[in-house]
């Protein structure tokens, strides 16, 4: 039930391991930090990471007459979270489902979760363009969707897959809000200097080539990794870090669009 949700943002990646779930989680926390009520929906059925990243593993969800009730991270209900990870007994339990069952579960997540009034719903998707993505795009025809953010790393092999993701969005009619280049450079935890250990600016160049916004470049920062397993926002814990600066810019961009 998305009738109380004002804005829906989908987070995509062409390849796994680019930090999409971390970006989704920190984006949700940054929006909450900015005074918005936020929902975070994890539809990566085979690799749900959001419960771990927010330290919510072991949380139990229950159903009411209106559907599943999401997990709230605080008493004020400023961040609501839903994931298949809450339905698994153990984090290591695999989800061995064929396409139709995955489709049914995602439709339930999109239609049978009792979201309260939300300013933003962030949908964290699995990598690639699979049944999960097609189901989401079909459901978004019935519910207004602001668009998609694509997360990539600067290497050319990741950028090739991003091009496929861009084509997928165009064919399904989803607006592209921009590209985030993640893992671009390494921030030394001692001196905070940033060193490019991979190629750099691939996301910037691709955004320019396909004429969509480049939302920012996020480095590898061990200090940010330490925040995994908690509901602490980079904006609170590391306000002067490069990651915090980029997240502020993305939030400002989204707010301006919506």
From Swiss-Prot:
SUPFAM superfamilies: P-loop containing nucleoside triphosphate hydrolases. PROSITE patterns: MRP (PS01215). Its main location: cytoplasm. GO terms for biological process: iron-sulfur cluster assembly. It is found in: Cytoplasm. Binds 4 [4Fe-4S] clusters per heterotetramer. Contains two stable clusters in the N-termini of Nubp1 and two labile, bridging clusters between subunits of the Nubp1-Nubp2 heterotetramer. It comes from the Eukaryota. ATP binds at residues 14-21. [4Fe-4S] cluster binds at residues 188, 191. One of its GO terms (cellular component) is cytosol. GO terms for molecular function: 4 iron, 4 sulfur cluster binding; ATP binding; ATP-dependent FeS chaperone activity; metal ion binding. Keywords: 4Fe-4S, ATP-binding, Cytoplasm, Iron, Iron-sulfur, Metal-binding, Nucleotide-binding. Its cofactor is [4Fe-4S] cluster. The keyword Nucleotide-binding applies. The keyword Metal-binding applies. Belongs to the Mrp/NBP35 ATP-binding proteins family. NUBP2/CFD1 subfamily. Heterotetramer of 2 Nubp1 and 2 Nubp2 chains. Component of the cytosolic iron-sulfur (Fe/S) protein assembly (CIA) machinery. Required for maturation of extramitochondrial Fe-S proteins. The Nubp1-Nubp2 heterotetramer forms a Fe-S scaffold complex, mediating the de novo assembly of an Fe-S cluster and its transfer to target apoproteins. HAMAP family: Mrp_NBP35, NUBP2. This is Cytosolic Fe-S cluster assembly factor Nubp2 homolog.
């Amino acid at each position: 039930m998305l009738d109380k949700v004002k804005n829906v943002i989908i987070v995509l990646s062409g390849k796994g391991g680019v930090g999409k779930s971390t970006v989704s989680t920190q984006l949700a926390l940054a929006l909450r930090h900015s005074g918005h009520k936020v929902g975070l929906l994890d539809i990566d059925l085979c690799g749900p990471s959001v419960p771990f990243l927010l330290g919510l593993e072991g949380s139990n969800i229950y159903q009411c007459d209106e559907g599943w009730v999401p997990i709230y991270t605080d008493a004020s209900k400023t961040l609501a979270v839903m994931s298949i990870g809450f339905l698994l007994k153990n984090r290591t339990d695999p989800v061995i489902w064929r396409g139709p069952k995955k489709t049914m579960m995602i439709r339930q997540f999109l239609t049978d979760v009792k979201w309260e009034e939300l300013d933003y719903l962030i949908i964290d998707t699995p990598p690639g363009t699979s049944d999960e993505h097609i189901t989401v795009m079909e459901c978004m025809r019935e519910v207004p969707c602001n668009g998609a953010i694509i997360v990539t790393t600067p290497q050319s092999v990741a950028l090739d897959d991003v091009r496929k993701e861009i084509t997928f969005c165009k064919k399904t009619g989803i607006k592209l809000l921009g590209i985030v280049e993640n893992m671009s450079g390494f921030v030394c935890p001692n001196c905070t200097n940033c060193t490019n250990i991979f190629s750099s600016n691939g996301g910037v160049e691709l955004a320019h080539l396909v004429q969509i916004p480049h939302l920012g470049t996020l480095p590898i920062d061990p200090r940010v990794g330490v925040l995994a397993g908690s509901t602490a926002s980079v904006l609170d814990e590391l306000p002067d870090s490069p990651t915090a600066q980029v997240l502020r810019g993305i939030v400002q961009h989204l707010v301006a669009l919506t």
